[in-house]
Structure formats: structure tokens, C-alpha cells
Amino acid sequence: DPVLVGADEHIRGMPEAYLGAALELGYDELCAEADLRGALVIPAHIDRTMYGVINQLGFLPEGPYAAVEAVRPLKAGAGRGYTVVTGSDAHYPEHIARRPFSLDLPEGWQHGGVVSLDAVREALAAGRARLPFST
């Protein structure tokens, strides 16, 4: 069970609620709500054996996805035609940036040091991601 630990490394208490499932929303509801609020909805590591949506549900459900993230090349049709990106999902410092990807962004992708999510959304929709592997 998780415990609350202070800066001095001493246990300060136990959480009052189970934190393993912090949301009461289902997958479809969460994706729809994120999209409604302008987020880029990108299901993560959809191909993982543990916790990947394809292995949990048997398929990738339809959704308002800007892209999908995969650990390795996907089987034909598994990504339902969405642009595939990669990420590290690092649990150890040495795993940070081990699966980078690049994205060709359009003119005007940044304004005053702020990245335009619309520019990222446009580049993902156009399939302008370059991966460390072929899909």
C-alpha cells in the first residue's frame, strides 16, 4: 500500500482512499472530455502486453485521437490509420528519450515561445511524424 512520506523520509500517514483508479470516467468518456477541452488525445503504448488498450480490449476503439503511441511497429490495421508516434514512458533515468520521434511542424507553430496545439494537431493529422522504426 502507498504511504505518505515527508521530506525527512519518515512516514506521515496512509492515504484515506485507494489511488489505483483515481477517475470515475471510462475510457470513452475520458477521451471525449479531453477532446472537448482542446487536448490532444493520444492513447499511450497501445501495443504493450500489460495495460495497452489493444491487449486489454482486443482492439483500438474509435475515438477523437490526434495520434496513437506505440512501443514497437504495429501490426497492419492496429492503429486504425492514425499517425503513430513513440515515447519513452520512462521509469528509470536511463530510459528517458529512448524512443524519440520527430514531427514536421507547419509555419507559425510557435507564438511568443508557446507551441500551438493546433499546429501539432495539423502535423499529426497529416502524418508528418518520423519514427525510429517503420510502421
Language-model regions, residue ranges each:
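Charged catalytic cores and adjacent phosphate/nucleic-acid-binding surfaces used
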Residues: 1-2, 7, 18-19, 40, ...
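Alpha-helix-centered segments that form part of catalytic cores
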Residues: 1-36
